[in-house]
Amino acid sequence: MGLGIPAPQPMRAVDYPAIRRLSQSLGRHAEPELWGSGECQLVIKNLDGQLLGWSRAHWWEPADATAPAGYYLAGIEVARGCRHRGVGRSLTEARLDWIAQRASSAWCVVNAQNAASLALHHSLGFEEVARAAQLGTVVFSGGSGVLLSKDLVSSRSAAKAQV
């Protein structure tokens, strides 16, 4: 955990208003009430209970020749004042732990223009699989998307070897 960032906690219905406010502050439109119940849904709050970020992961079947069905990192938002402080990394590592209990690989779709997200995912061992203007139901206006994958089996083996 980086620099005193609290651990991710399961998202609860009481968190939904703060998630919507955070999303709106970033020019987005999260609707947590519509998300599935079998997902990994996490939040990080400071000691005062203020939302610093949220994330989710779930099984996705994109019906796409390029992007396979699998467990995907599905969304993450971090408050502007909390970026580059470990919140996104902590949320992503927790989601990867959740996926590792269910699958041998994790997938992610990132806008090619999102350099910070690409850097984070590469630092966590994700590798680029493909680029396309559309991956599954995600259409990338003004650019392309990057399909990333991480082999969780070799990651677990490497972690065990270091112990």
Model-derived regions: residue spans:
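Conserved beta-strand in the GNAT
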Residues: 50-61, 72-77
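Conserved catalytic-core motifs of GNAT/GCN5-like acyltransferases
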Residues: 109-110, 125-144
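A short beta-loop-alpha structural element at the N-terminal edge
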Residues: 1-19
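A short helix-loop-beta-strand connector motif used in the catalytic cores of GNAT acetyltransferases and
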Residues: 33-43, 53, 72
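A conserved beta-turn-beta hairpin within the catalytic core of GNAT-like acetyltransferases
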Residues: 60-73, 83, 102-104
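Conserved acetyl-CoA-binding loop-helix of GNAT-fold acetyltransferases
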Residues: 78, 84-97, 119-123
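A short, internal acetyl-CoA/4′-phosphopantetheine-binding micro-motif in the GNAT/acyltransferase core
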Residues: 73-83, 110-113
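Conserved GNAT acetyl-CoA-binding A-motif
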Residues: 99-111
